[in-house]
Amino acid sequence: MRGGGTVIIPEGTFLTGSILLKSKVNLFLESNAVVKGINNLEKYRSISDLNQDEAYYKVKPRNWNKALLLGDQVEDVSITGEGVIDGAHIQDKKGEEGMRGPHILFLSRSKGIKISGVKLRRASNYAFMSYDIERASFDNLLVEEGWDGIHIRGGKDIRIRNCRFNTGDDAVAGGLWKNVVIENCYMNSSCNGIRLIMPATGLKIVDCEFRGPGKYPHRTSGEQKRRNMLSGILLQPGAWFPAFGEVKDILISSCSFDQLDNPFLVTLNEGNRGERICLEHIRGTRLMKAAASVESWGDSSLKDVRLSDVSLSYVGNKGQEIVGRTPSKPLTDYRALPCWGLYLHNLDRVILRNVRLVCERGKVSPASCFDNVGSVEIYNVSF
């Protein structure tokens, strides 16, 4: 493969439609450089135009797949520097929810991706969207406003490090992940911090801070301008559509959750199998509505679940408990549970070690509830 080099964007604001990314090319934004999306939807191209062979691109209409910067089957491509890529919150009346416009970045079937140092602001849909990428690193990014921050559907050997998210929708989302590390990131959202909607193996979420309420409103909430942060970590393959496969070798370590409705929810659905889920060194404060939970509602139990050195402090559930009743299968978010602290459903081989649950306001239900849980080991659990 020939060619390559660096394209330098100097100081200034540059209005543009779609830019096609090429292999072995680094797009470098100098300090105070702004690449801004033009308010003309006809100037944007769709990833569907570049890749018409993959059936799943056609799940969404062509205009949903438009982006400010996009590439298909590119390798060793990078976007670096200190500048800003501004999606400009351009609305498309024919888009999703009658308002979503182009993504900022969209890559498909690509390898060797590096995005570092830049600021992604006001995405008209997702800041970064991709299908089937490998060897991608996201480092020292600031992602603000818009909808999802980084959304990857099909990713292998991915690193998301030292990034700061202040998003209107999920900070990081997607699935079909293998060997993904999310490390030392700050997640602020008016939706969820990390939402997994398809299977994943070898996922590590380490040294991350999840803090609400959202700096920017959930754009889809319209006049409500809702800002409450829902869940910190939401692992729920199959909640939005059938997504068969495994959720295994998941490590969530040294993470903090503050002023969220719910700290974490792990749920398996039909066609999912799960094992070796570890949550350790977890601290949750000022949790507001729903208990943390690990659940399987599919055709098999979730095996080998370990919670170690976990401290969760709730300020009150505000009517989110259903005392004495078996909860329903969750849909796409947390829901009412029969306890205020920790709910486990259809699990096998569970270890709870140094787990502390605190409710700072009136208790109307048990601290925890175990439903169809076998082989439980409990060491130093208090509430």
Please state what every model-predicted region is.
Residues 1-383:
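Extracellular/periplasmic carbohydrate-active domains that bind, remodel
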